[in-house]
Regions:
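Short, conserved sequence motifs used for protein processing/export or organelle targeting and
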Residues: 5-195
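Short, well-ordered junction/capping motifs at the entry into regular secondary structure
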Residues: 1-2
Length: 195
């Protein structure tokens, strides 16, 4: 059998092969748009601001996401309620994805000069996926302006008494709508918990 780390590495390699143009870090995609290095999806960090501004300036808001949550400290229970409204007529395979983020985690980090900073502050640490790798199917055909979809999720937060970085005031949810065929993100929101 294959080890989990080897299996994860194989998945990563396949995903990178599906997105040609990646030559190394720091590179990233901006909503899977062409226009990066050699007109691929991959942008060097020096071009991220321009790519993001270009994406924002298009002004195409196709969906609106609203999120409310209830947190019960006695059980670490988190109940998430979402409302997604489509603002245009679209055709595609739309999924709602919800991530749990730790806002600040102090942990060792190897620095550029080779030293280790044992008290490095890592920000926006992806900590869990509330509803699976590709989230929850919202609609896999046409949607029209005004279509509304509701979804509810329950999740048990890790115990903050064993890892204080899971204190509810250090947590956020990042929620987004993704078109699964081309991976474009229609809308994303961040909701801070406990505040």
């Amino acid at each position: 059998t294959q080890s989990p780390s080897s299996a994860a590495s194989d998945v990563y390699k396949r995903q990178v092969q599906e997105m040609p143009g990646f030559i190394g870090n720091p590179m990233g995609t901006i909503n899977r748009n062409d226009g990066g290095y050699s007109n691929t999806n991959w942008y060097f960090s020096s071009n991220w601001a321009t790519g993001v501004n270009d994406e924002i300036s298009q002004g195409n808001l196709d969906a609106n996401i609203q999120l409310q949550y209830n947190y019960y400290p006695s059980t670490n229970g988190l109940f998430i309620h979402t409302e997604t409204t489509f603002l245009n007529t679209l055709s595609g395979n739309y999924h709602l994805i919800v991530y749990l983020i730790r806002n600040d985690v102090v942990s060792p980090q190897k620095m550029n000069d080779g030293t280790i900073d044992h008290h490095y502050h890592h920000h926006a640490v992806l900590s869990n996926n509330i509803n699976g790798t590709w989230g929850t199917l919202v609609n896999d055909s046409a949607v029209v302006n005004g279509d509304v979809f509701y979804h509810d999720f329950s999740f048990e937060l890790p115990d903050s008494s064993t890892d204080s970085t899971y204190e509810v005031n250090n947590l956020s949810l990042v929620t987004y709508i993704c078109e699964r065929n081309n991976f474009n993100i229609l809308q994303a929101i961040k909701t801070e918990l406990g505040n």
